[in-house]
A protein has these predicted regions:
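A short Gly-Trp-Pro
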Residues: 1-136
């Protein structure tokens, strides 16, 4: 099975072969800032199962593990599509939102729970919350 992840303008594309080795939901402040959201979700694939097409720019940031993370984003639209965790040089992480696939496998772990926004998790089960197919 192949899955395609793209940036917002589709100029940066990542084709991933096979199933992800893990899918991780991360509440750390760095992922919150990277996504502009309350958390990030990454799918980790073996490096040899990844094919990148299109230009990317990169930004290296430190991580809590002491190993840097090299983030790759589209120079046109600015979307971060994938990153290289230097702690795991044989893996590439791809932002799950870049697949835009509601059937993508759910996270198998959640990390940095101490930074979790208290309302995360409540929203999915909240009665009376407006729910629609489009932004209103």
């Amino acid at each position: 099975m192949e899955r395609l992840a793209t940036c917002a303008c589709s100029e940066l594309r990542v084709t991933c072969s096979g199933e992800p080795e893990k899918v991780s939901l991360c509440h750390c402040p760095a992922c919150q800032k990277r996504t502009g959201s309350a958390f990030g979700i990454a799918a980790f694939f073996a490096r040899e199962n990844i094919r990148v097409e299109g230009a990317s720019r990169s930004y290296e940031r430190p991580s809590d593990s002491g190993f840097p993370v090299l983030l790759h984003f589209c120079p046109g639209c600015g979307s971060t599509v994938f990153w290289e965790p230097r702690r795991k040089p044989d893996m590439i992480a791809v932002g799950v939102g870049s697949f835009a696939d509601p059937t993508f496998p759910a996270p198998s772990q959640a990390v940095y729970a101490e930074f979790r926004h208290p309302w995360v998790g409540e929203m999915a089960s909240r009665e009376g919350l407006p729910f629609g197919d489009q932004q209103g």
